[in-house]
Amino acid sequence: MTHLERSRHQQFPFHLVAPSPWPIVVSFALMSLALSLALTMHGYIGHMYLIYLSILTVTLSATLWFRDIIAEATYLGDHTIAVRKGINLGFLLFVVSEILIFAALFWAYFHSAMSPNIELGGVWPPVGIQAVQPTELPLLNTIILLSSGATITYSHHGLVGGNRKNALSGLLITFWLIVIFVTCQYIEYTNATFTITDGVYGSVFYAGTGLHFLHMVMLAAMLGINYWRLRNYHLTATHHVGYETTVLYCHILDIIWLFLYIVFYWWGV
C-alpha cells in the first residue's frame, strides 16, 4: 500500500508499524552477546562458541530488520515527513545517550588518573603498565578518522547537489577508511602489553576505546548499507534520512575519538 493509497484510509501521517519479531530477537541476541563477553573475561570454557553464535544471530536478525525498514521506506512509502522527523529526533536522542555513556567513561578515567592511589603506585599509568604510544598506531588512526570525516562530507555534498558519482565515490572511500581504522585498532589491541583485566587502567582504557571500536564496526555496516542503497537509486537529494543519520554518526564518532586520543593516549601517558 503506497502513501497515496494509505492516505485515503487514515487521517494522520504517522506509520503504524506492523508486528515484527526483530526487536525482541535482536534484544535477546545482544543480551547473549553481552553475557558471552562477560564469560570471556572470566575464562569460562567454550565461551568463544557463544560469542560466535551471538554475533551471527545479531548480524542475521539486524540484516532482516534493515530489510523490512528499507522496504517500508522505499517501496511502501511509509516514511512520510512526520515519520522522518520522528526518526531524526530518535537518532538525536540516541546520540545524546552515547555522549553521556562516554562522559561517564571519561569521568572514570580522570577519577583514577588525577589522583592515583597507593595500590597503583601513586603514578599514572600504574606501575607495571606499558601504555600505548600516542605517536604510533593511535596517531595513524586519528589521521584516518579525520580523513573519513572529510570524505563523508564530500559524499554528502555530492548527494545533495545531485552529483551521484561524487556521492558514491566519497561513500566508498569512507567505508574503506573505516575498515582500515578498525583493522589498525584490532592490531593495536592484539599487540598491547596489557589487557582489560589489568587493573583500573586496563578496564577503563578498553571500555572507552573498545566501545568506540564497536561503534566503528556499526558505522562500517551502516556505510555499506547506504552505499548499496545509493547504487540502487533508493536515495534522492531530498529523501535520505538513513544516509543523513549515518553522516551525523560518523562526525560524532570522529569527535569522540579526538577526545579519546587526547585523554587516553596523549595526556594519560
Curated annotation (Swiss-Prot):
GO biological process: mitochondrial electron transport, cytochrome c to oxygen
A molecular-function term among this protein's GO annotations: cytochrome-c oxidase activity
Keywords assigned by UniProt, alphabetized: Membrane, Mitochondrion, Mitochondrion inner membrane, Translocase, Transmembrane, Transmembrane helix
Protein origin, superkingdom: Eukaryota
Compartmental location: Mitochondrion inner membrane
A Pfam family: COX3
CDD domains found in the cross-reference section: Cyt_c_Oxidase_III
Reaction equations catalysed: 4 Fe(II)-[cytochrome c] + O2 + 8 H(+)(in) = 4 Fe(III)-[cytochrome c] + 2 H2O + 4 H(+)(out)
InterPro entries per record: Cyt_c/ubiquinol_Oxase_su3, Cyt_c_oxase_su3_dom, Cyt_c_oxidase-like_su3, Cyt_c_oxidase_su3-like_sf, Cyt_c_oxidase_su3_a-hlx
TM region(s), chain numbering: 21-41, 45-65, 90-110, 138-160, 167-187, 205-225, 247-267
Record-level GO cellular component terms: mitochondrial inner membrane
Membrane topology: Multi-pass membrane protein
EC number per UniProt: 7.1.1.9
Complex and partners: Component of the cytochrome c oxidase (complex IV, CIV), a multisubunit enzyme composed of a catalytic core of 3 subunits and several supernumerary subunits. The complex exists as a monomer or a dimer and forms supercomplexes (SCs) in the inner mitochondrial membrane with ubiquinol-cytochrome c oxidoreductase (cytochrome b-c1 complex, complex III, CIII).
Similarity comment text for this entry: Belongs to the cytochrome c oxidase subunit 3 family.
Function according to Swiss-Prot or TrEMBL: Component of the cytochrome c oxidase, the last enzyme in the mitochondrial electron transport chain which drives oxidative phosphorylation. The respiratory chain contains 3 multisubunit complexes succinate dehydrogenase (complex II, CII), ubiquinol-cytochrome c oxidoreductase (cytochrome b-c1 complex, complex III, CIII) and cytochrome c oxidase (complex IV, CIV), that cooperate to transfer electrons derived from NADH and succinate to molecular oxygen, creating an electrochemical gradient over the inner membrane that drives transmembrane transport and the ATP synthase.
Protein name, entry field: Cytochrome c oxidase subunit 3
Taxonomic source organism: Kluyveromyces lactis (strain ATCC 8585 / CBS 2359 / DSM 70799 / NBRC 1267 / NRRL Y-1140 / WM37) (Yeast)
Taxonomic classification: Eukaryota, Fungi, Dikarya, Ascomycota, Saccharomycotina
